[in-house]
């Protein structure tokens, strides 16, 4: 649809001045979709959706089969917010193809087409069907013949009023509705009824029954399969769709159905087989699923094959859509839309809903549209259509043509433009105008003419090079086109240039030093100046790297850089950059940092022997200070970190890159590294060399701490410390144990072929108890035998004592302590005695659970503590030595005394007089099961002293002579034959400045009350107040 020229001009001006999001052409939010409407629906209303946005609000029209729908002439039609409502829809009048059209002042767009169809299912016309007569064993087809309908159908059959099930002998085609029986049996005789269901309306109708009877003229013989249900030769299938192929055969015996691809490829695993293989279903169909498929029906009489080609198709799908374009008059427009699909889509173009063809300035080639020298008549709504036989898609865009005179309202010339003397400046002139204007410049009131210094570009910008002071002033840009003239003025200010007076200079420094790189300038003081520094091309971040870098100077014309604690990583190029609003310049300096050498490279083991390794390496960077020496370090699995090693030459100078490491252990895996040094310091070590093992050699190190002793009767036990693996010098390491009776000449030898052996036991009845032997242990490996250790004397195992101790006696010391006495055995022992073992147990316990304590040497008594009071204990004593214990003495019994009193002294009162402290307390009475109180112990100490003094008394008072210049801590407890009883709470008597004082401890009637009191209240009063 073509709009009036005046409306387009007005639209262009409004579009130019308004926000793009405010005014625009129609845009579909929702387009109509196909509708299958059930004729028997109770709703009696159809809605075709069409939702559009635009400003101004678009007007919506509908077309049916290309003809406008007149909603005013037919009350059944109404348009609500763009969507078309049809009341009481009629199959004859309303079925067809609908399309929505949207129009506003910017143009017109049309929607995709949508079909309205009516779903229905009529009743069967006939009420009876002829009887079908077949032989037993014969195949049979019962025709359904569905009545007139619209919408997809599904089929089922009823056999004698019951649903007919499907198996390998029966099949219902969902394409034709027919019932197939591969081989009729006697049980198949009866009435068959076809049931047809419309899947849209769910309406169901039953056909007339068909009687099936068996003929009496014989049984059908065997015959090969005959395929009655087969899929078409070509089955086009959409991408992503689900395709179902049917195949069923009659035959005797009942045929089996097998599916396969003719090209030999396996059928996709996603495929499913139904109804005894009668249906092959392939979901989510893709290009790789296309091909020739075969259905093979086979029985013992033969086989038949049905074939069909599954072809792949895809509706068009956008790869590239078109977008809105806003252009000035006389410019060019190019649109391109791209879609994929199968078959390949073709393209059409619409302008304002009407076909667009190639003519004059408009060139169309497939998905491209080219409009040259655009004018106002080209404005409108454009649509690109991509179409193949399976569908069509739309892409919509708006072409806005701007026609307006020059306007500087949003793009005024810069009010002030700064430039330095000798510099170059461009004053931009960018008014909004369509078509493109012609530009003129003035300086002051004079027209500016171009010369070799002053030029005006095609887009209107003014360029001046080699600026002088005389170029300063006001400049005006004048823009003119068909629709008017406009101008804008700005000022050019010329400033003196900035110059670096003290640039940074290259320096040579040592690691750890600090320096200042100067950067001082002269500049126009009316301009702000900014200093920045870069290091090796990267700006220095003074916040992040403040540990090393700091800006110093203190003047706006100085931007010096201080570098503190310089490291090797700080070597490189430093650039001071100075910037004002009119110029930018820089000055650079190189910083050389001298430091310890870098790590040497490529440390290689050239040759290795049993104790030496020949190494070579390449020097690393010397960091600007010659390397003076190298040190070689080694590491083994047995060393703690890296260790310096001896070399030849002993001192390796900086010009030597090979050395021999000496003093290595044979048959040990080594790795080496090299460290370089110069006058500044020691550098980082090299990467380790490869690991190499030294060659084998005879062992040289003998076992340490050769000793022994102990063991069982007639045994000589010899022990030693194993030789560390790094000192074994080779594989097959072991020990040679040599021993002989003391004073004899001939050695007995035993070989132990284990590097881990550390003990040998010689057992022989001829070995006397505790007799001396000379012992030494040697070493060997695959290379041969090594030395023996020094000879040492080891005693054979001794015999345990043979006689028991005598005269056992025990007595009770308290409720918790017993003392036991015994005498040495009366008869001579064959085994020496190293001490005695006392065994004790309670009467109610078993002897095997007894506790034991040991004495050492000739001690013939011991004290047993931590026992229970009033308990009967049994005791026995044995002599022992390293071979074990001897026979037990006779058992003696002893009963511990009653426990001491559990109640502490209570009601403690104290007073002081003439350097004395007098304590009084209540008498403690023992319980029936406790020992009688024999007296009391008073324990006292200075508050700062750890040692305690004790006074015993059989009274309930005591007098202490103590100086008053210290605080005292005092406790009181009873004692009895059963031991010491419970102690009172501690009483603190403070340092007393007055000669007379009185106080009391907590009053306690039992132990529980005493333990619950956490503080002691002390009151002091002068004697005069008593």
Swiss-Prot record:
Residues 1-18 form the signal peptide. Residues 886-896 have a biased composition (Polar residues). Residues 687-696 have a biased composition (Basic and acidic residues). Residues 32-117, 122-207, 225-311, 316-400, 406-493, 497-586 form the Ig-like C2-type domain. A lipid is attached at residue 1000 (GPI-anchor amidated serine). Its main location: membrane. Interacts with PTPRG. This is Contactin-4. It comes from Homo sapiens (Human). The gene is CNTN4.
